[in-house]
A protein has these predicted regions:
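C-terminal catalytic lobe of FAD-dependent flavoproteins
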Residues: 271-273, 279-285, 291-384
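Short beta-strand to alpha-helix junction loop
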Residues: 62-63, 90-99, 137-157, 299-304, ...
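Flavin-dependent oxidoreductases
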Residues: 175, 186-277, 294, 298
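Beta1/beta-strand and adjacent pyrophosphate-binding region of the FAD-binding site
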Residues: 2-13, 31
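Dinucleotide-binding Rossmann-like beta1-alpha1 core, especially the glycine-rich loop
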Residues: 47-125
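N-terminal Rossmann-fold NAD(P) dinucleotide-binding loop
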Residues: 16-17
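Helical element adjacent to the flavin cofactor pocket in flavoenzyme catalytic cores
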Residues: 137-178, 188-192
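Glycine-rich FAD pyrophosphate-binding loop
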Residues: 25-44
Length: 384
């Protein structure tokens, strides 16, 4: 007997889970196909930051804020650990402080709850901050912290208990209009098919990626043992200002980039910007570097890890910590400046990928858009 669904989702990372979630919320019969026993890619290898502060004001900021709402709903419904810990951007140079002042004073901060703190006020808000050399801090209360190593499993379990058909340890080897073929030869039939295959650009619709400027990105990360302090808030420094689109229109950003290129070129050569997230158990997730291209080495470089730890150690007290884990993640990213790759290679099949390292922040809202639009299209077709 044919297996018939309203929606078939390929890939159980955060993008795939979000499509299944949106389909379920719309009353659809959903099947979710995942080739691994559980999510093992970028969804579990990241900071766990829900990061509206880094998204450009406008469409992406609104998406991030909607995703934030969805994560809080998942915290209530699925038991996902999502904490409203906020973020702190640390300025240790006058040009970095100028960027933060420009950001708060302009429309670039629209939709956020931001404030500027003196070194004294910042040290009271974050007991681990190093005050020596600190110029000022921008604090935002908008960002969430989730536990990436458990979030996907909890969402998947809740989806399954709510009626979504979970097909684990089986891969989709072919997708056509209305049908997905699995490795065991089974055929699933569905009105809408969403392909969210993460870093796998070769199996399903490789032409869709070849037509776009898509690259894989390898990033090195670590976790540190819990320090003596507990702050919760995500920490970012001056390097991060040049990484996220939210700060692009701040006039002083050029000075920040030029100074790092001149004085510390190693960071730019390896795409390093440094952030830290504190887990519920107090341990720190830190990173990261960015190496683009198909030939990224499978071996991690300790000089990159050392540079990340040393830079973070200038912002917060790491004297009582040590490295407990090292890993690298890989994600797909569009290199033409666009936020997401979305296309329909054949009628009824949507490929969604390349959210550029912001899958946790943008994925839930983008998936909601995709599902809503596909349902609207189907309704229009019925009335044509």
């Amino acid at each position: 007997m044919a297996e018939q669904y309203d929606r078939i989702v390929v890939g159980a990372g955060i993008l795939g889970l979000s499509h299944a979630l949106a389909g379920l919320a719309a009353g659809e019969r959903v099947a979710l196909v995942e080739r691994e026993p559980r999510a093992a890619g970028a969804t579990v290898r990241n900071f766990g930051m829900i990061w509206p502060v880094g998204m450009r004001a406008g469409e992406d900021r609104q998406r991030a804020l909607r995703s934030r709402e969805i994560w809080l709903e998942l915290s209530r419904d699925a038991g996902v650990d999502a904490r409203s810990d906020g973020s702190m951007h640390i300025a240790r140079h006058e040009d970095e402080w100028a960027v933060l002042q420009e950001f708060v004073a302009s429309d670039a901060s629209a939709g956020l709850e931001c404030e500027l703190l003196s070194p004294e006020d910042a040290s009271r808000a974050h007991p681990g901050l190093r005050v020596e050399g600190l110029v000022g801090v921008m604090r935002s209360t908008t960002e969430l912290a989730v536990e990436p190593r458990t979030a996907a499993d909890r969402i998947a379990a809740w989806l399954e208990s709510s009626g979504v058909t979970m097909l684990r340890s089986t891969a989709a080897v072919r997708c056509e209009t209305g049908v997905v073929v699995l490795t065991d030869g089974r055929e699933l039939y569905g009105h809408a098919i969403n392909v969210c295959s993460g870093a796998d650009l070769r199996v399903l619709f490789p032409d869709a990626y070849e037509r776009q400027q898509v690259s894989l990105c390898k990033l090195q990360m670590m976790s540190l043992s819990a320090p003596s302090w507990r702050a919760g808030a995500h920490v970012a420094g001056g390097l991060t200002l040049g990484h996220y689109a939210a700060f692009e229109d701040c006039p002083s950003l050029t000075s920040v980039r030029e100074r790092y290129a001149r004085e510390q070129p190693f960071f730019g050569e390896h795409g390093i910007h440094v952030m830290s997230a504190q887990r519920a158990d107090g341990t720190l997730v830190i990173g990261d570097s960015h190496e683009y291209g198909p030939g990224a080495s499978p071996f991690d470089r300790e000089d990159i890890n050392d540079a990340i730890v040393n830079y973070l150690g200038e912002m917060v007290d790491l004297r009582e910590t040590h490295v407990i884990d090292r890993w690298h993640g890989v994600y797909a990213k569009r290199m033409d400046g666009q936020t997401v790759l979305r296309c329909e290679p054949v009628p009824g099949v949507t490929v969604l990928n390349c959210v550029g390292g912001a899958g946790m922040t943008l994925g839930p809202a983008i998936a909601e858009e995709v599902v809503r639009q596909s349902r609207n299209f189907a309704t229009e077709g019925q009335h044509a």
